């Protein structure tokens, strides 16, 4: 897709991840790899019983030098946050929009003996600078989620999509 756009003369790129609820980590890594030079950390994940995993760029991407902007909103989650976090932390492009959803968990599927499966959270992922995107939760402090949402609502950060002020 990128090669086709470049063949048609595209010189700058905007990746719109608004309302993108995510996907698979490997696909996010493949996408980011298109925009980063070699040997840049894309994402890492670790958990209590999950060996640390690091994904590095290979420098073979087709848009390593072109200007880049990434659009996100409060519904951009998971793989969208991996992509935007890697672009931001590697100073590769500009991130425009609202604070993202905050889903930074790695899930693994386990097949059961009857053929069904269960997906369990096994780790958290972190952006190259070490930020964990996952919203914090401490047992017994669920009201913090509500306080966060109310604070965002009061400051026009949760419901008003036109909260950015600009001159006419």
Features from the language model and the residues they span:
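Cleft-lining beta-strand/loop regions that shape enzyme active-site pockets
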Residues: 1-113
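Conserved functional hotspot residues or short segments at active or partner-binding sites
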Residues: 128-168
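Short, small/polar residue-rich loop motifs at catalytic or cofactor-binding pockets
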Residues: 119-120
């Amino acid at each position: 897709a990128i090669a086709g756009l470049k063949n048609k003369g595209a010189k700058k790129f905007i990746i719109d991840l608004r309302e993108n609820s995510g996907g698979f980590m490997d696909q996010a890594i493949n996408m980011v790899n298109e925009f980063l030079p070699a040997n840049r950390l894309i994402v890492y994940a670790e958990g209590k019983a999950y060996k640390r995993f690091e994904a590095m760029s290979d420098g073979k991407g087709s848009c390593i030098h072109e200007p880049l902007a990434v659009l996100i909103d409060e519904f951009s989650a998971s793989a969208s946050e991996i992509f935007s976090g890697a672009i931001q932390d590697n100073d590769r492009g500009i991130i425009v929009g609202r604070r993202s959803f905050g889903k930074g968990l790695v899930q693994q599927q386990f097949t059961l003996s009857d053929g069904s499966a269960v997906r369990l959270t096994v780790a958290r992922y972190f952006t190259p600078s070490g930020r964990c995107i996952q919203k914090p939760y401490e047992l017994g402090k669920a009201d913090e989620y509500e306080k966060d949402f109310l604070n965002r609502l009061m400051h026009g950060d949760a419901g008003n999509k036109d909260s950015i002020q600009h001159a006419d």
